[in-house]
Regions:
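Central hydrophobic cores of alpha-helical transmembrane segments in multi-pass inner-membrane proteins
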Residues: 42-53, 69-80, 98-111, 259-261
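Interfacial loop-to-transmembrane junctions
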Residues: 266-285
Length: 303
């Protein structure tokens, strides 16, 4: 009997160990599966907003409002399932929070009847957000590593949240300016050819596109000033050198300089056409490298 009991206890211990090991391997897969399912739902939620580009005549109606709300809801559900905090230093988190900020600002402008016919950009904004969502899902498949997050005294500092908020708003405004610049190029090409296309008819007029791209950049410059000041203050809270220039700070300062130069030239002269578009796209590229670009390098290339 003692031998039988000994063997039974050994089998029970072995079974418990096997269950623990299989559970350890099964849990990450379940967690990964729920995150990917949320990513697919997020992509589907962006399709109605992207489909606005196919409407014969864009309108600010209930279908536009519903597509904006669905895109925002899908992004928030994704952030809730993945647990990506706004202070996370991950690449996917940067893309998803940037998407949500663009949706909220664009939705607010549409509801409040913002700048000249900004709602005509809905389909192109949806396509941009869809590209970001697919990119984030691809990198989620490549590696589901847990990114670093801000901790220590900086986490409880108001400067951190001012810096994060201003960074997201600045990048969203510059993104909207870049999309307005794209609309400007399409309208300018149609006017030169004296043959409007179905794509140019769906976009804001040339003058409205120029007004929006410059206006969005002006707003972004003011918000970026807050971001730069809060960034230096955050360094002080973290005990880092104020004069240490890293890649993110350098690219941000270059982007700010590019925006200020464009605004200065536009106010002092009659800067029009392709030159203004180049400045806008240059500022967008620099801020893209400074925000999600740095996260990509540190998370998947260097890290």
């Amino acid at each position: 009997m003692s031998e039988l009991r000994r063997r039974l206890s050994f089998c029970e211990g072995f079974a418990k160990s096997a269950n623990a090991i299989s559970g350890a391997f099964r849990a990450p897969k379940t967690k990964m599966g729920s995150k990917m399912l949320a990513a697919y739902i997020h992509i589907l939620a962006l399709l109605p907003l992207t489909a606005q580009i196919m409407r014969a005549e864009p309108r600010r109606d209930v279908w536009l409002y519903a597509s904006i709300c669905l895109a925002a809801l899908g992004t928030m559900v994704l952030l809730g399932v993945t647990g990506e905090e706004v202070q996370s230093r991950g690449f996917a988190a940067a893309l998803h929070w940037s998407e949500l900020t663009v949706i909220m600002i664009f939705g607010g402008l549409v509801i409040c009847k913002g700048p000249h016919q900004v709602w005509r950009l809905a389909g192109y904004i949806g396509g941009y957000l869809l590209l970001f969502a697919i990119l984030a899902a691809i990198f989620r498949l490549i590696g589901d590593n847990d990114p670093e997050t801000v901790n220590g005294p900086a986490l409880y500092s108001g400067w951190l949240w001012a810096h994060i908020g201003s960074s997201l708003i600045t990048y969203a405004l510059v993104t909207l300016a870049a999309i307005a610049a794209m609309a400007y190029v399409v309208q300018e090409y149609a006017l030169k050819k004296r043959k409007p296309t179905r794509w140019s008819r769906r976009l804001p007029p040339l003058r409205d596109s120029e007004y929006m791209l410059v206006g969005f950049l002006k707003w972004s410059a003011w918000v970026l000033i807050i971001g730069i000041i809060s960034g230096f203050a955050l360094r002080y809270v973290e005990g880092r050198s104020l004069w240490e220039i890293d890649h993110k700070m350098l690219l941000t300062l270059l982007g700010f300089a590019t925006i200020c130069i464009l605004i200065f030239i536009h106010e002092r002269s009659t800067l029009r056409g392709r030159m203004a578009v180049r400045f806008v796209l240059g500022a967008w590229l620099l801020l893209t490298l400074a925000f999600p670009g740095v996260r990509l390098v540190t998370g998947y290339i260097v890290g």
